[in-house]
């Protein structure tokens, strides 16, 4: 049961407050006997509401404004004016703003840190409505939940997505060519596919399980790669090649290893790249193997590490014909593994002499 009085009390009610006046001690003569009879329950109800209003007025006074809730007009107008000012102040706040946490408190758990608060029951509530346990729940050891990703992490993720998109674009522009004759060079292979579009890169690889080889050809656009599929079945050397869309991109070569001069390009023509070499095989074993089948070896570099189960080698022959003959050794077992031989993209440069340490 709520009775709203007119005048100043009604003005305060319009401003958002509900003002209840207690019944007069002696009812006016215009009231009926039914109106004058107020039960003790109603009086108790009015008394409780008055206590709430007095408590509300005390809280309002604490935030810096004194409101006189009296029967005078000034008190109601003052309350209404203060409420308008308070509403104007609240309207200027940004509801999307995040809570500022000083660096000294950012590493500590506690009330209000990381945009949440602890209840008396020990539960931790975030501003987004998610609840966890007071000791951190699914969060970190500091009692807070995982922080938002930093700008650096977001930038790295963006770079990773960009890199992945670029890689997928390269794959769509690349074709896979199989059943390549051992005598076919990369120049001859690129010359066949140049009619389909501009060739960006051409890479021939050895197959240890076959005397034939395979290759990857990258074009400047997808149209070139699509046109290249029509060349499947074309005779190149002594075998018809198979052309399929590639599932991988050509692995880039470190540009610092590429030939820099005409002499180094001539060295590449005499050099082969050998992979899948048994770790028990020594450098002398590799040299003896290729000299027995192909010709004199001028320089050899055997490389390996503890992370890979096999090793690789760059073998430079005295004659370019020996390097071509070495391509036929792909698939031959050396030690306990079949080796893979392909033309080298890089020359075997002599090691620079080390300066003595003083």
Swiss-Prot record:
Annotated motif Bipartite nuclear localization signal, positions: 146-157
Keyword Transmembrane helix appears in the UniProt entry: no
Disordered: annotated span: 1-45, 136-164
Compositional bias (Low complexity): 1-19
InterPro entries with a match to the protein in the record: CID8-like_RRM1, CID8-like_RRM2, Nucleotide-bd_a/b_plait_sf, PAM2_motif, RBD_domain_sf, RRM_dom
PROSITE patterns: RRM
A cellular component annotation (GO) from this entry: nucleus
Start-end of Polar residues biased regions: 31-41
Gene3D superfamilies, per the entry: 3.30.70.330
MF terms (GO), sorted A to Z: RNA binding
Repeat in keyword set: yes
Compartments where found: Nucleus
Pfam families xref list: PAM2, RRM_1
UniProt domain RRM: residue ranges: 173-248, 270-346
Name of the featured protein: Polyadenylate-binding protein-interacting protein 11
Source taxonomy: Eukaryota, Viridiplantae, Streptophyta, Embryophyta, Tracheophyta
Gene that encodes the chain: CID11
């Amino acid at each position: 049961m709520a009775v709203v009085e007119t005048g100043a009390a009604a003005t305060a009610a319009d401003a958002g407050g509900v003002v209840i006046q207690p019944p007069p001690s002696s009812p006016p003569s215009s009231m009926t006997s039914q109106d004058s009879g107020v039960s003790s329950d109603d009086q108790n109800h009015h008394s409780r509401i008055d206590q709430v209003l007095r408590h509300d007025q005390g809280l309002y006074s604490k935030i810096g404004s004194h409101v006189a809730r009296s029967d005078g007009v000034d008190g109601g107008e003052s309350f209404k004016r203060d409420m308008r000012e308070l509403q104007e102040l609240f309207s200027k706040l940004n509801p999307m703003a995040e809570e500022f946490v000083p660096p000294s408190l950012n590493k500590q758990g506690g009330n209000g840190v990381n945009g949440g608060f602890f209840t008396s029951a020990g539960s931790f509530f975030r501003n987004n409505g998610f609840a966890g346990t007071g000791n951190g729940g699914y969060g970190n050891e500091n009692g807070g939940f995982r922080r938002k990703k930093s700008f650096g992490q977001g930038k790295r993720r963006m770079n990773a997505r960009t890199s992945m998109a670029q890689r997928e674009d390269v794959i769509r522009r690349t074709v896979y060519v199989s059943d390549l004759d051992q005598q076919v060079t990369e120049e001859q292979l690129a010359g066949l596919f140049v009619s389909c579009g501009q060739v960006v890169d051409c890479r021939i690889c050895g197959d240890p399980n076959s005397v034939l080889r395979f290759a990857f050809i990258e074009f400047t656009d997808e149209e070139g790669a699509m046109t290249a599929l029509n060349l499947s079945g074309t005779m190149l050397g002594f075998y018809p090649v198979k052309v399929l869309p590639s599932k991988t991109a050509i692995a880039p070569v470190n540009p610092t290893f590429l030939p820099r001069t005409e002499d180094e390009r001539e060295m590449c023509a005499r050099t082969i790249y050998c992979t899948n070499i048994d770790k028990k095989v020594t450098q002398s074993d590799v040299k003896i193997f290729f000299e027995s089948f192909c010709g004199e070896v001028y320089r050899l570099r055997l490389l390996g590490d503890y992370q890979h189960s096999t090793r690789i080698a760059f073998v430079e022959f005295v004659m370019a014909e020996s390097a071509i003959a070495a391509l036929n050794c792909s698939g031959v077992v050396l030690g306990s593994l079949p080796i893979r031989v392909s033309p080298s993209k890089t020359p075997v440069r002599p090691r620079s002499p080390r300066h003595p340490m003083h």
